[in-house]
Amino acid sequence: SMYKTMWDIRNFEENARHFFSIGQIPGFVHLYSGEEAIATGVCANLTDKDYITSTHRGHGHCVAKGGDLKKMMAEIFGKSTGLGKGKGGSMHIADLDKGILGANGMVGGGFGLATGAAMRNKYLKTDDVAVCFFGDGAANEGNFHECLNMASIWNLPVVFVNENNLFAESTPQWYSSGSPTIAERAQAYNMPGVRVNGKDLFAVYQVAKEAVERARRGDGPTLIEAITYR
């Protein structure tokens, strides 16, 4: 159930926070606590054959897409039993069997991967879709514009999901963006742009359902802006 998925994400993150705080996890962790409704509501509409790309704050996406919790935690600990044999760590968790193309330490690094995955799906004439999760800071990277433009031109089955937690590290969105909302940027690329309360699980689920079904039908990409906080 979606409730269990949200609980699994929060429980996973609380454990990650604890072990990081006592120095047992190498490197750094960016926790998804508080944003669980977005990954859960979106991924509830996906299958194992659908692809997602994630962010440096990506544990929640991987859990919601069906990633193995024990192997994920092993990866964060740098163990050879992890999904990436302990080589990727917190910011590079991937599981191709579940369609998880990877969390990404590069801000905005998932745009090209998701667009490419969607191009693959269209070329092979499948009804699989790709979903790109990204933060508000990534919306100001050049490849945001490039990939949304390509997705529109080629009518690709991809859904861009902006998790707008209002701050890119410590920079507020109003200070870094000329447009009042990220969703309205979709107009420039002739695709639907939808704004939703990212704390409302059922609202996110419904908006994502419409976007995913649109992509599966071959009607092209959608940009979703989910307002949340971390």
Predicted regions and their residues:
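Residue-level marker for buried hydrophobic side chains located in beta-strands
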Residues: 133, 160-161
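Cofactor-binding active-site loop characterized by glycine-rich and histidine/acidic residues
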Residues: 14, 24-154, 172-178, 183, ...
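Flexible, glycine/charged-enriched surface loops at secondary-structure junctions
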Residues: 15-17, 130, 219-223
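N-terminal glycine-rich anion-binding loops that anchor highly charged ligand groups
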Residues: 4-20
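Thiamine diphosphate
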Residues: 162-230
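Loop/turn elements at helix/coil->beta-strand transitions in domains of secreted/extracellular proteins
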Residues: 156-157, 219
